[in-house]
């Protein structure tokens, strides 16, 4: 359960990082 939550968090961070790079 902990690993699944971590993976979901990592995915969210990656999505935010991509959107930030698109803005720049």
Curated annotation (Swiss-Prot):
InterPro entries: Humanin. Signal peptide: none annotated. It comes from the Eukaryota. It is found in: Secreted; Cytoplasm. The keyword Cytoplasm applies. The keyword Lipoprotein does not apply. Keywords: Cytoplasm, Secreted. Induction: Down-regulated 6 hours following staurosporine (STS) treatment and up-regulated 24 hours following STS treatment. Down-regulated 6 hours following beta-carotene treatment, returning to its basal level 24 hours following beta-carotene treatment. Expressed in testis. GO terms for cellular component: cytoplasm; extracellular region. One of its GO terms (molecular function) is receptor antagonist activity. GO terms for biological process: negative regulation of execution phase of apoptosis. Plays a role as a neuroprotective and antiapoptotic factor. Belongs to the humanin family. This is Humanin-like 7. It comes from Homo sapiens (Human). The lineage of its organism: Eukaryota, Metazoa, Chordata, Craniata, Vertebrata.
């Amino acid at each position: 359960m902990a690993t699944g939550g971590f993976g979901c968090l990592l995915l969210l961070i990656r999505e935010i990082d991509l959107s930030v790079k698109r803005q720049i």
